[in-house]
């Protein structure tokens, strides 16, 4: 494994080939990805703490057909920078098995507000698995978007603040009208807080803390010791210029 500090992300991404199961350690500090980090191999990213290591940028997990890619991240903040990103801060977009595990992390949307960019994690691939432990998400659109069938979302602890903290959508499915009788998707959350952020022009554009859309059927959701909270009125982050 690498097991060394990623002192220059430009060097890391342009001159070094990441191998399967490599581990990249980020010491305390702030770093900026020069482009969206594309992953077709399983790697681990380790920081020095949620508030100590800040990585600006976006990551896409893109497993090959018949294969799997696991992204394991701990002890850092990933902050959005690209308003044109099509897959959120972390996109799970492969044709194989995409797995993401976040521990003691934060996904911070920052100033990113575009609909596809200002999402914590977009789960777009069939069978995607996302696990979050003591991880916070604070973004301007969807915290976590489940967008395909046979997906698994497991949450333990953390605070999730977004226009929709958890949102299911048929957007990535193959039926032309987006309808699927049974997605066989499972959502499990315990000891977590989900907060709905008002978007655009005040109360009329509030959405919800957890949204299970009507065309995305057959979801099993189990919430234990969780708080779902709606925020009434204008959101100061998004609506400062419109208020």
What are these regions (language model features)?
Residues 44-47, 71-75, 99-104, 129-134, ...:
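All-beta strand scaffolds that present successive hydrophobic residues in beta-strands
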Residues 196-197, 202-243:
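Predominantly polar beta-repeat domains that present long G/T/S/D/N-rich surfaces used to bind, process
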Residues 10, 20-44, 49-58, 78, ...:
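N-terminal extracellular ligand-recognition/capping segment immediately after the signal peptide
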Residues 30, 49, 77, 106, ...:
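A structural signal for beta-strand register positions
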Residues 52, 80, 109, 114, ...:
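Residues in short coils/turns that link rungs of repeat/solenoid architectures in beta-rich domains
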Residues 58-60, 70, 85-91, 117-122, ...:
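Structural detector of coil-to-beta-strand junctions
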């Amino acid at each position: 494994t690498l097991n060394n500090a990623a002192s220059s992300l430009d060097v890391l991404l342009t001159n070094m080939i990441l191998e399967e199961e490599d581990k990249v350690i980020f010491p305390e500090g702030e770093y900026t990805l020069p482009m969206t980090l594309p992953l077709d191999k399983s790697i681990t990213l380790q920081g020095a703490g949620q508030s100590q290591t800040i990585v600006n940028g976006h990551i896409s997990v893109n497993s090959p057909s018949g294969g799997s890619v696991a992204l394991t991240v701990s002890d850092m903040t990933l902050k959005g920078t690209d308003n044109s990103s099509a897959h959120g801060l972390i996109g799970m977009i492969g044709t194989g098995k995409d797995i993401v595990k976040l521990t003691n992390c934060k996904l911070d949307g920052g100033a990113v507000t575009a609909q596809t960019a200002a999402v914590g994690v977009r789960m777009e691939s069939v069978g995607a698995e996302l696990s979050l432990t003591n991880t916070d998400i604070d973004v301007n659109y969807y915290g976590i978007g489940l967008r395909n069938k046979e997906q698994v979302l497991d949450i333990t602890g953390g605070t999730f603040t977004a226009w929709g903290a958890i949102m299911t959508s048929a957007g990535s499915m193959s039926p032309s009208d987006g309808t699927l009788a049974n997605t066989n998707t499972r959502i499990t959350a315990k000891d977590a807080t989900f907060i709905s952020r008002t978007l655009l022009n005040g109360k009329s554009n509030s959405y919800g803390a957890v949204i299970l859309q009507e065309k995305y059927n057959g979801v099993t959701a189990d919430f234990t010791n969780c708080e779902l909270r709606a925020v009434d009125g204008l959101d100061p982050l998004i609506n400062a210029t419109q208020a």
